[in-house]
Amino acid sequence: MKTLYSLRRFYHVETLFNGTLALTSRDQETTGFAWWAGNARLINLSGKLLGAHVAHAGLIVFWAGAMNLFEVAHFVPEKPMYEQGLILLPHLATLGWGVGPGGEVIDTFPYFVSGVLHLISSAVLGFGGIYHALLGPETLEESFPFFGYVWKDRNKMTTILGIHLILLGLGAFLLVFKALFFGGIYDTWAPGGGDVRKITNLTLSPSIIFGYLLKSPFGGEGWIVSVDDLEDIIGGHVWLGSICILGGIWHILTKPFAWARRALVWSGEAYLSYSLGALSVFGFIACCFVWFNNTAYPSEFYGPTGPEASQAQAFTFLVRDQRLGANVGSAQGPTGLGKYLMRSPTGEVIFGGETMRFWDLRAPWLEPLRGPNGLDLSRLKKDIQPWQERRSAEYMTHAPLGSLNSVGGVATEINAVNYVSPRSWLATSHFVLGFFLFVGHLWHAGRARAAAAGFEKGIDRDFEPVLSMTPLN
């Protein structure tokens, strides 16, 4: 029987509830956790826990590579990406790979390379995960003290936090370098309907970048989700990357202040709950971003936003009826308001009809027709370009509506197509995952606080039903 080198490892707040120190096995008798508690069995086995995390990373990267190649294999260049149920290729296209003017795909080879690179990486991670889970040392503290840790060692934990922050900062700078030096990224606002361009004039003004954080989250303001030019997005990544790297260096060099030592719970389960809370926030923000923002998520690849499809419909019928002789500036609708054009509460000229509620929308195909006071009547009469008509007609018929059975469009629409927008999928999935992560945050935070107070929340270990059932084997 293998006895661990030091008893200190068993004095952190997640106590083992069986009173034994032998960790030769990973069953309920030796760890206090049943098989379905997963990595909880590895709380004190830093080497095995490393294996679990590396293997998990391998699974994630394998999915990315395999799904990437699957999308490449099924991709039809003649159809827009958003009509093909793709969620990975739009991200690669947004980074400027394989696309040209108007978001047209001119080369799918970079997408193939991306998939293969992820598959190769996943094999390396998978090998590392299996090695550390099965063959490597159970604990790292004795052999590799730099990689070892004790959960309640506050200084070591903030050092690990610092390393993670530096890696996140470097990740932010990868996007900056791609946009500045390595071919640029796709700009949906480029003249004539979008193109790949290098970002030359970064927005680094703190009043602009941090002004987004001070905006209201509601219509017309839209908090950080309202960002609508790439200079601000890349400048924001410069700020964020710098803050993460400097914060990481700070956390590596310093020890937690007394107030932080008192205020926070210092245990593995507490760190899990903090991480789940942060990921939950990321999920909710990503949901809003992909649903409303057509700059970071260009409509050429992800399909139009909801407001964009609605405004596109109003625009399409304005174009049609104007050609048929309607005076779009003065025609009245059934409610007495303007049929095609009306005024917003603050006086701008906006599209009339039901789409009036989306008068905030900014989209690259529509902005050239605006003047200082909203939509410009003379431009609407003389200046509409064919590409704007084509794009709005396309967006009108591809609203991000749809159900789980992939029947797209408005429920009452008789000509509905079999289409569900990637925006619907990505927004819904990130909202749902963000919610589940939030519930997990509450669960683990409650357990961690209870353990710190000296008792345990959760399923009763001694009398849970499964213990009285016949073993599966």
Swiss-Prot record:
Q: How does the cofactor attach, per the note?
A: Binds multiple chlorophylls and provides some of the ligands for the Ca-4Mn-5O cluster of the oxygen-evolving complex. It may also provide a ligand for a Cl- that is required for oxygen evolution. PSII binds additional chlorophylls, carotenoids and specific lipids.
Under the heading InterPro entries, the entry gives: PS_antenna-like (IPR000932), PS_II_antenna-like_sf (IPR036001), PSII_PsbC (IPR005869), PSII_PsbC_sf (IPR044900)
- Keywords assigned by UniProt, alphabetized: Acetylation, Chlorophyll, Chloroplast, Chromophore, Manganese, Membrane, Metal-binding, Phosphoprotein, Photosynthesis, Photosystem II, Plastid, Thylakoid, Transmembrane, Transmembrane helix
Family the UniProt entry places it in: Belongs to the PsbB/PsbC family. PsbC subfamily.
The record's function comment reads: One of the components of the core complex of photosystem II (PSII). It binds chlorophyll and helps catalyze the primary light-induced photochemical processes of PSII. PSII is a light-driven water:plastoquinone oxidoreductase, using light energy to abstract electrons from H(2)O, generating O(2) and a proton gradient subsequently used for ATP formation.
> How does the record describe its quaternary structure?
PSII is composed of 1 copy each of membrane proteins PsbA, PsbB, PsbC, PsbD, PsbE, PsbF, PsbH, PsbI, PsbJ, PsbK, PsbL, PsbM, PsbT, PsbX, PsbY, PsbZ, Psb30/Ycf12, at least 3 peripheral proteins of the oxygen-evolving complex and a large number of cofactors. It forms dimeric complexes.
- The protein depicted here goes by the name Photosystem II CP43 reaction center protein
In its UniProt entry, the species of origin is given as Fagopyrum esculentum subsp. ancestrale
* Source species taxonomy: Eukaryota, Viridiplantae, Streptophyta, Embryophyta, Tracheophyta
Name of encoding gene: psbC
